[in-house]
């Protein structure tokens, strides 16, 4: 796929342009300079043609604790991109940072560079004073306002017009899209860098280094995956700035854009209430979740240590009993392959399709062996079961009246279905519906998940 990188000094509207192009607010946008630190990837479609857009941190001559690492990230983006959008701001004018960015880009004579002048709001284009911008050495800029969508169509036309110069790159089908979530400093970015085999995101002992939810596609054993790394979620009292509040929102959005979750824990410390809260997000999302215990190389172990830690996890995360638990060290690159082995197992279970006759045999047999308890004045009777379409295994059980369902019996049936069809690593959903039209009007359908049931 064609790759286009957005490069420029801080606060020229790079992230606003990125969000405008992908039509989705992924990058954090704020007036505070330096908000974007890592490379952020997104897909753009225009006139039936697609390309990948890369947002980058701001280039500056000023000293900053992260500036050297940010510049390294920008350099990575330039190296992998086919086209560079060099963005300046008409509102702020040019300064030493613009000239610094221009000097860096001029070193890449083999790259196609589109000079973009942003933050042109209501000015008449014919009355703009552009003389100072010619001094940067990239000719006349394309005039846009990312915030107000002015000139965006022309910019997209320019990019698509150059696409044929780079040939058609065959797009490989994704095996899985997953996000990595966890509290700050558990090693999410270290894991991402191992997966991508390069320093894609900033890694530091300072919690909160990653602010955005960062998309990246990568190949493992010749198969393509998409991973979304997220900012760590802090305790509510520690969310001191609006930037970190945005980061929590990005994490929640990352989950909504994923098909699977890697919940990272720090194996070198005890589990915390914060870990439990984040685990609750996994349950609410109702997505397959792999519990990844990181920093296992730092733990003093004997032959019982792993099992004891697993018991602690099961006790804390009772609402995720189906989630597999794996132990890794991202920094030392230990047991990373177990992540992909587990993903493949989960993918296989998600694809299981069960014939209606076989499903009914299992449910009716379970129904005969263990009769439902009397609940709300009557006993539940199940007459028919079928598998419905869904992102996770979903089953509809037609019964005399869902009001007679006790949650313990729903859990019993779920476990029987899991055992019969090998659905051990994925969440499943049971819908109990009345077979009788009259009862359907008088009662509500019941949706059951592992830890309880909700009225629909």
From Swiss-Prot:
Q: In UniProt terms, what function does this protein have?
A: GTPase that plays an essential role in the late steps of ribosome biogenesis.
Per the UniProt entry, what species is this protein from, by scientific name?
A: Mycoplasmoides gallisepticum (strain R(low / passage 15 / clone 2)) (Mycoplasma gallisepticum)
Q: Which UniProt keywords apply?
A: GTP-binding, Nucleotide-binding, Repeat, Ribosome biogenesis
Q: Which family does it belong to?
A: Belongs to the TRAFAC class TrmE-Era-EngA-EngB-Septin-like GTPase superfamily. EngA (Der) GTPase family.
Does the record carry GTP-binding as a key word? yes
Domain (KH-like) spans: 352-436
Q: Which GO terms describe its biological process?
A: ribosome biogenesis
Ranges for domain EngA-type G = 2-167, 176-351
Name of encoding gene: der
PROSITE patterns from the UniProt entry: G_ENGA
InterPro entries, A to Z: G_ENGA (IPR031166), GTP-bd (IPR006073), GTPase_Der (IPR016484), KH_dom-like (IPR032859), KH_dom-like_a/b (IPR015946), P-loop_NTPase (IPR027417), Small_GTP-bd (IPR005225)
What Pfam families would the database entry show? KH_dom-like, MMR_HSR1
Tell me which residues bind GTP 1.
Answer: 8-15, 55-59, 118-121
State the name under which the record lists this protein. Answer: GTPase Der
């Amino acid at each position: 796929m064609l790759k286009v990188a957005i490069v420029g000094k801080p606060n020229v509207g790079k992230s606003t342009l990125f969000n405008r192009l992908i039509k989705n607010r992924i990058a954090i946008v704020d007036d505070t300079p330096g908000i974007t630190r890592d490379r952020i990837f997104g897909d753009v479609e225009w006139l039936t043609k697609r390309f990948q857009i890369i947002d980058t941190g701001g280039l500056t001559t000023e000293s900053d604790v992260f500036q050297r690492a940010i510049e390294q990230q920008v350099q990575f983006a330039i190296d992998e991109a086919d086209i560079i959008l060099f963005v300046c701001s008409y509102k702020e004018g040019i300064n030493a940072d613009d000239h610094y960015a221009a000097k860096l880009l001029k070193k890449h004579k083999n790259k196609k560079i589109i000079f973009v002048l942003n933050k042109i709001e209501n000015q008449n284009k014919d009355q703009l004073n552009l003389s100072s911008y010619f001094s940067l050495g990239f000719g006349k800029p394309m005039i846009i306002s990312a915030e107000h969508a002015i000139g965006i169509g022309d910019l997209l036309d320019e990019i698509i017009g150059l696409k044929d110069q780079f040939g058609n790159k065959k797009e490989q089908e994704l095996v899985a899209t997953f996000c990595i979530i966890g509290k700050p400093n558990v090693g999410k970015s270290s894991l991402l860098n191992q997966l991508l085999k390069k320093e894609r995101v900033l890694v530091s002992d300072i919690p909160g280094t990653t602010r955005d939810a960062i998309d990246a596609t990568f190949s493992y054993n010749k198969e393509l995956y998409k991973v979304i790394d997220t900012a760590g979620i802090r305790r509510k009292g520690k969310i001191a700035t609006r930037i970190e509040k945005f980061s929590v929102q990005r994490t929640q959005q990352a989950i909504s854009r994923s098909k699977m979750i890697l919940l990272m824990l720090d194996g070198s410390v005890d589990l915390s209430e914060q870990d439990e809260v984040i685990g609750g997000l996994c349950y609410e999302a109702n997505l397959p979740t792999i519990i990844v215990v990181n920093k296992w190389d730092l733990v003093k172990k004997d032959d019982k240590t792993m099992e004891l830690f697993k018991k602690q996890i099961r006790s804390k995360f009772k609402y995720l009993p189906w989630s597999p638990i794996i132990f890794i060290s991202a920094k030392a690159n230990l047991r990373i392959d177990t992540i992909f082995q587990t993903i493949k197992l989960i993918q296989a279970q998600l694809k299981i399709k069960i014939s209606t006759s076989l499903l009914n045999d299992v449910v009716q047999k379970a129904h005969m062996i263990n009769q439902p308890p009397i609940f709300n004045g009557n006993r539940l009777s199940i007459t028919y079961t079928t598998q419905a379409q869904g992102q996770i295994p979903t089953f509809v059980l037609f019964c005399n009246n869902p009001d007679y369902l006790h949650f313990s019996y729903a859990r019993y049936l779920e476990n029987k279905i899991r055992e019969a069809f090998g659905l051990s690593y994925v969440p499943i959903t049971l819908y109990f519906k009345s077979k009788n039209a009259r009862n359907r009007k008088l009662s509500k359908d019941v949706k059951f998940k592992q830890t309880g049931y909700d009225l629909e």
